[in-house]
Amino acid sequence: MRKNTYAMRYIAGQPAERILPPGSFASIGQALPAGAPLSSDEKIRVLVWNIFKQQRAEWLSVLKNFGKDAHLVLLQEAQTTPELVRFATTNYLAADQVPAFVLPQHPSGVMTLSAAHPVYCCPLREREPILRLAKSALVTVYPLPDTRLLMVVNIHAVNFSLGVDVYSKQLLPIGDQIAHHSGPIIMAGDFNAWSRPRMNALYRFAREMSLREVRFTDDQRRKAFGRPLDFVFYRGLNVHEASVLVTRASDHNPLLVEFSPGKPDK
């Protein structure tokens, strides 16, 4: 684990807090006492979006319109600008970001906004071998109303690499986290699965982890070389609804998924 791998936690009225990777898996679910559950009703609403470093207009209105009712917002390429931090801390109990690399003004990386305080937080980074830029991932755990713990993996996969070795290597520590968690799981983000070998590596990983893929009927996901880049995988939950929002506010379209707790239908 590199020494510059950490998460920044943003909570309203508090200074930003730096969180280092936990020392062991034993702390999953024990790092902090479980507070209020992520959702008090029977649904868990999730928004997944590569926000393109907020470079386009309307990104905030999309978040306000579609993110405010979500229990989890999983962003990739999120820059911690004052506007985004203000939205996050105003509408969510916690926002955790893993800076992949520091831009001149604000760090950019994956960011998870949540309606509950995480009881576990593990930041991960992997460097792209060609551009030498890092991509980040974040593993967080939240209490559910039925006392189970939900693991959430927010990932932006490496993009430029020869072969799939580095791509698969980024998934390895995530697999270690999942292997030590017995409860439900949501793994989502921009997987940059633009080639057949990458798709094969991703599906093989999902299969090994017993994760199912969320299917979108009107599939308007961003594609590269004819293949979608953004995915949502899950375990130990039911998919109630899944849709893709078409917008010009980013070069990716947001994914909206509504889960219900409980064992998935066969």
UniProtKB/Swiss-Prot annotation:
Subcellular location: Cytoplasm
Highest taxon in the source lineage: Bacteria
Disulfide bridge map: none
UniProtKB keywords: Cytoplasm
GO cellular component: cytoplasm
Name under which the protein is recorded: UPF0294 protein Ent638_0743
GO molecular function: catalytic activity
Stated family: Belongs to the UPF0294 family.
